[in-house]
Amino acid sequence: MNRKNYLLAFILCVQTLFVSAQVYPVRAKLTDEKSFSMILLPDPQSYTKFDANQPLFELQTAWVANSIESLNIKGVLCTGDLVEQNEIRIPDGVNGNQTSEEQWRAASRAFERLDGKLPYVICTGNHDYGYQKAENRLCHFPDYFPAERNSCWRKSLVAVGNNYQ
């Protein structure tokens, strides 16, 4: 190879360093300044039941936290089924590889990003009760989402009932 080819190869290598540099993604924004956004997070149990999927749910709530101002987000609604099974001690690997406790912790960890920043409403679903299939009303939701958890709830929380025993 002659000098010209070496110089060309060097320039291309240096140039790729600058071309592949990551930039912060373009933030979504509202077209009407008077508008606001409400975010819906449906059925996250598919994210919490496998350890490999848990970071995906955390990315969703991170995106919400990072978009509060640009999208004028006023609240988040999660439609329930935070976990696949409320009281599973030994996962079968097919319907998840996380115990119920690990699933509840993953859901709680994802929502921590919104605590103190944004009010959110989490509805419990049938997967959040009982041992496997909502055969009783036992639910670990109050253990991971106590009423005192998010200071943004103070203006909107009306009542909290005890867990059915």
Question: What residues fall within each predicted segment?
Answer:
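Short, structurally constrained coil/turn elements
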Residues: 15, 32, 69, 114-116
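Extended active-site neighborhood of metal-dependent phosphoesterases/phosphodiesterases
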Residues: 88-165
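Positively charged n-region of N-terminal signal peptides that target proteins for export
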Residues: 1-5
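Residue-level recognition of hydrophobic positions within alpha-helical transmembrane segments
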Residues: 11, 77-80, 124
